């Protein structure tokens, strides 16, 4: 029996085998170190998805997919997908609890013709437009004409099972969507009003004198004055198909795309039946005239692990990550959102959880949000 001679390599016994395991296992065992390793790569800071810290995921939009709604859209950003359906319901003024006070407020609002007749009025047209939008938003808010609702209990992620009451995240997202709908002054009240049609003019009867003609004309003039009889209430349902970060941004884009797709029937108040009727012709339907297209950009601050495991020190440092995915959101304590509108105007800023993002960093995020708005506006126009 032959005996195998010992190895002539002196380092064979002393060289330990390297311990290797998949990247997914590394991410689960030490997620912070895993993300730090990517951001401190010699090739430059790259996230596990291959994006740079300031790079957002491109969205895709498909509108008009739901036939039972007045407007719908499906939006996907990375692995996050949202379906938005908008349906209008008629709210009669008889069902408004405080309708008389709302009417008095409307009477106190000067019209455009009245405001221009003031001899010493120095208000510019832009300021008048802003005031009118604020008044429209106040009326929409008082009547509760915009009713958003977000549903995460669709199995979109392991954290949101299709059982139980709405989660805290779903309620928070609904509140943020509702707040931005009003603070951005997105809709005009004129698009939601339903007026009474004036009665057809009757043939004048022969009149014997001027007094009789004047008595017959006055009631006709009063009857011919149009009145607001009802409003459109928009019920906005947002369902998450899948969720992997940037829930607010994706939900808001789906809402904007669905609003662009809305076509409300031509509704009017019929004096004979004292009810609101809708035209069956699709050619008579109308779109919503949006005042602006506010676009959000969410971000988070990641504190990396440096030498010795000290967070925020050494080689790790701090990184501002925009459009975070689900893995990155779990590692960022300081988060926020910047919303910009037409002309780069800052509509809203939300931030909490830390003090890394100061004025300089926020200015850079606003510029990134302006660039993202141009991208999203192009996607909405194509969709």
Label every model-predicted segment.
Residues 2-383:
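Polyanion-binding surfaces on beta-sheet-dominated domains and ring/shell assemblies
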């Amino acid at each position: 029996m032959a005996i195998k001679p010992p190895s002539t390599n002196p380092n064979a016994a002393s060289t330990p085998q390297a311990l290797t395991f998949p990247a997914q296992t590394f991410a689960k065992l030490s997620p912070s170190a895993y993300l730090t390793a990517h951001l401190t790569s010699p090739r430059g800071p790259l996230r596990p998805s291959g994006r740079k810290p300031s790079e957002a995921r491109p969205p895709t939009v498909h509108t008009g997919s739901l036939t039972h709604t007045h407007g719908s859209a499906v939006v996907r950003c990375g692995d996050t997908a949202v379906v938005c359906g908008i349906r209008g319901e008629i709210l009669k003024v008889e069902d408004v609890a405080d309708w008389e006070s709302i009417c008095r407020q409307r009477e106190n609002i000067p019209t455009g013709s009245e405001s221009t007749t003031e001899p010493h009025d120095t208000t510019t047209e832009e300021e008048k437009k802003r005031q009118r939008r604020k008044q429209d938003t106040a009326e929409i808010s008082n009547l509760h004409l915009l009713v958003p609702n977000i549903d995460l209990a669709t199995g979109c992620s392991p954290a949101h099972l299709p059982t139980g009451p709405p989660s805290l995240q779903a309620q928070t997202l609904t509140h943020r969507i509702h707040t931005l709908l009003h603070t951005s002054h997105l809709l005009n009240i004129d698009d939601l009003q339903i007026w009474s049609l004036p009665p057809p003019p009757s043939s004048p009867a022969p009149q014997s004198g001027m007094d009789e003609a004047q008595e017959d004309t006055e009631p006709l003039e009063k009857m011919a004055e149009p009145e607001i009889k009802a409003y459109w209430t928009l019920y906005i349902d947002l369902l998450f198909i899948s969720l992997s970060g940037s829930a607010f941004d994706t939900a808001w884009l789906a809402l904007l795309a669905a609003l662009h797709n809305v076509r409300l029937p031509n509704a009017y108040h019929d004096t004979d039946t004292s009810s609101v009727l809708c035209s069956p012709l699709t050619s008579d339907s109308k779109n919503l005239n949006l005042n602006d297209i506010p676009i959000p950009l969410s971000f988070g601050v990641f504190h990396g692990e440096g030498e010795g495991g000290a967070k925020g020190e050494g080689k790790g440092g701090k990184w501002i990550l925009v459009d975070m995915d689900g893995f990155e959101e779990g590692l960022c304590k300081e988060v926020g959102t910047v919303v910009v509108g037409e002309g780069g105007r800052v509509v809203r800023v939300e931030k909490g959880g830390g003090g890394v993002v100061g004025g300089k960093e926020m200015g850079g995020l606003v510029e990134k949000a302006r660039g993202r708005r141009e991208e999203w506006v192009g996607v909405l126009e194509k969709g």
